[in-house]
Amino acid sequence: MYDVAIVGAGPAGIYAGFRLKEAVESGADISALIIDAGPQVQKRHCVARELGRTCSKCPVCHLHSGWGGAGAFSDGKITLSPDVGGWMSKVTGQERLRDLLGRVDQVFLKFGAPSQLYGSDDERFELWSRRAALADLKLERNVLRHMGTDLSMEVMSRMYDSIRESIEVRLNTEVVAINRDGGHVTGVTTRGGEVIQARAVLVAPGRRGASWLAEQCSSLGIAVSRNPVDLGVRVELPADVMAPITDDLYEPKLRFISKSFDDPVRTFCVNPRGEVITEYYDDVVTVNGHSMKDGRTPNTNFALLVSNYFTEPFKDPISYGKYISRLANLLSNGIVVQRLWDLLHGRRSTPERLSRGATVPTLKDATPGDLSFIFPHRILTDIIEMLKALDRLAPGIVSMNTLLYGVEAKFYSSRVETDENLQTSVRGLFVAGDGAGLTRGLSQSAASGLHAAESILSSLGFR
């Protein structure tokens, strides 16, 4: 029997592992296991991305599963602002989260993250904050480090080698069930039928495992609450248009309230000189973006997302988001790309029209089309209104050279109800990260794993 079993080797699981490793090296007699359905980070390969093809729908998606989780293939932004990247402050309080993020940052630095900080210059932030306000936008403080996808994978690989010195890691092993006896967790069962017993279990399956975790919570009688689903587009344009603000802040976090519908709209995942990519969630293909530390493109991309909150009797926002995404898949066999200029003038984009613009699409297999056949009028209106506001902040956004890809969707899992220690109503069962609906990014996910690990150590009588 293990003292602790961690399901998921993404940022939450890894940082929980680091905290347990620290306890072991301080003399605690702890046996711990990290389990993940995917392979080691250096063995993770996306055939579709490498060959420039449409998603192959592999049984185990290497973009989301394996050591490092989705974070290994992300843009590698280490966000240090407690207001960005999730809802952990509601669990821990602002000061505790700030401390956790600082400790997360120190570990990243130890394993090779760059020392350069973006967004820490108060004077530049205030300048852009005033300019944003004049354009009806709100700029959020977002202090971060940028690793890029290439360096992110290297850092995760070094972490793998370090954790294995004290913690057992079992990859290519899928957990299918969480086990309990009465009101206490007893372990997990793998797809191969192996029952792994543990005194405490931390479940951190990432967004890829969100639906599975929701099913497990239902069978275990654990309450969950609904998070919103964010739907929108990935915007791609010449990097020079955004350079004045991205050179200062790297990733400006901008919020907007639409005039027509009073809906919240925001920028997300800004990638200066990056590329647009696809990702796969269950049975739908969606769009995303990233950038490398090396290998820069002439384009910048970012998402514009509209938060969709649903009330009774509707209880399945994730299915709604997938429904909209499937419309794009149906019309294009994947992702639709449209010039903003064509959208504003009520016409579909064609290969010929795309070729007239200065922006060469970095997602080569996107199909030129018409996003108005995909998005509800309300969401499309929200997006267009924010693009026009952004054009006042960075002139040139509303132009013939701006491309819109759809659909970008962020399926923020149903939030698992926990106490302040991230323990569920089943004693000994803890949750963390994006898959539990607590976070939506690399840093807060890692912080949640660290917080959960310290709670587990305390519950087992270790310090």
Predicted feature residues:
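Dinucleotide-binding Rossmann-like beta1-alpha1 core, especially the glycine-rich loop
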Residues: 58, 65-118
